[in-house]
Amino acid sequence: MAPYRLDVISLAPQAFAPLPEVGVIGRAFGAKIAELHLHNPRDHAIDRHRKVDDVPYGGGAGMVLKPEPVFAAFESVPVCSRRRVLLMSPQGQPLRQVDLQRWSQDYDQLVFLCGHYEGFDERIRSLADEEVSMGDFVLTGGELPAMTIINGVVRLLPGTVGTPESLVEESHSDLLLEHSHYTRPADFRGMTVPDVLRSGDHGAVALWRQQQREQRTQERRPDLWNRWQQIQNPTPPAP
């Protein structure tokens, strides 16, 4: 199977240097489960000063990323059979676990468009299939959001995580948050491991963990709890 291809268009490609070197994600790159390719729009600038930004039409603060070098960098990227182009933007849809699952399963290539400066020329949006946000805040560029998505997608690819079962019950895999975990010692500074986890009763452990997931979600993320409840108890159609 060909490696999952990740192409990043960024003015700060050096920011991605640690990705292939760290943890299970680094090992996935080393094992050719995924490949990372970096493309700098500055390498495609058309003037001798390699200019990639300019002042905004209509005036205003800051500089705007020019379309020409970004389009040229984008058009230099090889196209795989199942490609998805993601624009990192605070105006995009908030990232969800279901998005990471969809991208890891339905595609074999992701292309990331990372903005900088005050923003990017509006015409750059035409390149994207989706716009993705990390939340209701603004960063200096799209590199950190892109790295977050790369981490989240690569860890879901077959062969990355040694125990695939560990991905099944983790937080957000089915809208519920993950249950609590304990390891030795059984008693630490008066904080003890629940008896059920030491009982050897696998059915009781599974029930306790599910109850923990529901309780945590209800307390910490009522928005997710309400969505989960709606799925479990759908409203019947009106007669």
Curated annotation (Swiss-Prot):
Biased composition (Basic and acidic residues): 211-224
Broad class of the protein's primary localization: cytoplasm
Entry GO terms, CC: cytosol
Region (Disordered): 210-239
Catalytic activity: guanosine(37) in tRNA + S-adenosyl-L-methionine = N(1)-methylguanosine(37) in tRNA + S-adenosyl-L-homocysteine + H(+)
GO biological process: tRNA N1-guanine methylation
Family annotation (InterPro entries): Alpha/beta_knot_MTases, tRNA_m1G_MeTrfase_C_sf, tRNA_m1G_MeTrfase_TrmD, tRNA_m1G_MTases_N, tRNA_MeTrfase_TRMD/TRM10
EC number(s) recorded for this UniProt protein: 2.1.1.228
Enzyme class: transferase
Subunit structure: Homodimer.
Descriptive protein name: tRNA (guanine-N(1)-)-methyltransferase
Gene: trmD
